[in-house]
């Protein structure tokens, strides 16, 4: 019985990169790009790369409270309690920085 030759054999990868070899290369490149992108996004959010991460011992600049915080605290002209006061524990510098920067 004579064997038939299939010229459109997808399993045959020649030097031109046709068939399955070419498809596998494209899939590999796409997967690598997606994985690298996800790693960069995760590292940026964690502060491992970029300037968004908190530095140990570094002073952060004072920022103006947002209008939402102003309304909650009685308006922009209301004086905040003295440091160390237990009157409003939600308005400490640490909690304000935490609310602003996550």
From Swiss-Prot:
One of its GO terms (cellular component) is membrane. Residues 1-21, 49-102 are annotated as: Disordered. Residues 56-73 have a biased composition (Basic and acidic residues). This is Uncharacterized membrane protein ECU08_1550. It is a single-pass membrane protein. Keywords: Glycoprotein, Membrane, Transmembrane, Transmembrane helix. Residues 93-102 have a biased composition (Polar residues). The chain crosses the membrane at residues 24-44. Glycans are attached at residues 16, 90. It is found in: Membrane. It comes from Encephalitozoon cuniculi (strain GB-M1).
């Amino acid at each position: 019985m004579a064997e038939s030759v299939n010229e459109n054999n997808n399993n045959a990868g020649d030097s031109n990169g046709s068939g399955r070899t070419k498809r596998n290369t494209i899939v590999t490149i796409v997967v690598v790009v997606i994985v690298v992108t996800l790693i960069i996004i995760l590292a940026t959010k964690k502060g491992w790369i970029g300037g968004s991460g908190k530095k140990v011992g570094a002073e952060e600049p004072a920022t103006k409270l947002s209008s939402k915080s102003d309304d909650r605290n009685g308006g922009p002209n209301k004086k905040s309690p003295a440091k160390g006061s237990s009157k409003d524990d939600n308005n400490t510098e640490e909690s304000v920085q935490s609310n602003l920067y996550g």
